[in-house]
Amino acid sequence: MLMLIEGSRLLNYPILSLHTATEIARVKALVVDPNYLKIVAFEVAAINSHKRLFLDVNSIREFSKVGIIIDSDEEFVEQGDIIKLNEIIALGFVLDHMKVVSKKKSLLGHVQDFTVVTDDFQIMQLIVKRPIYKALIDPELVIGRS
C-alpha cells in the first residue's frame, strides 16, 4: 500500500516478523543516500541483540500502519556486511536541522522534517523551519522534489 509518511514518524517504528507474527525490533535511525535523497536502510534496535544492526529497505515485505513487515530477524545485517551500505553509513548524512539555502545563497531555514513515499522510500518533500525574521510571514516552507 502506497503511503506518504513524515520521516520523524519512522523513528521508533515497530518491525514485525512474518514468521513469528511479533515485534522483533524498532527503527533507531534512518540511513539516507545523499546522492538520490532516498532512505536505503534503517538502523534497528533488535529485541534479542545488542549489536549495531541494519535493515535494507529491499528486505521489507510490506509497510503498514501496524509496522514494517519483514520475513524474520535474519534480514538484519551488521554494518560491514554490505559494502555499498557501509559506504553510505560512513558518510553520516543526516537531514534533521540541515541548513537549506537558495541558489542565491540566502538562508531559507533548517530542515525540520520530510515526507517519504513508502513504496521505494524516496524523500518527496522537505519541511523547512524558517528563520525568525522570515517566520513572521511564513513559519514553514515545503520544498517538493523536482
What residue spans do the PLM features occupy?
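Peripheral interaction segments used for macromolecular assembly
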Residues: 1-146
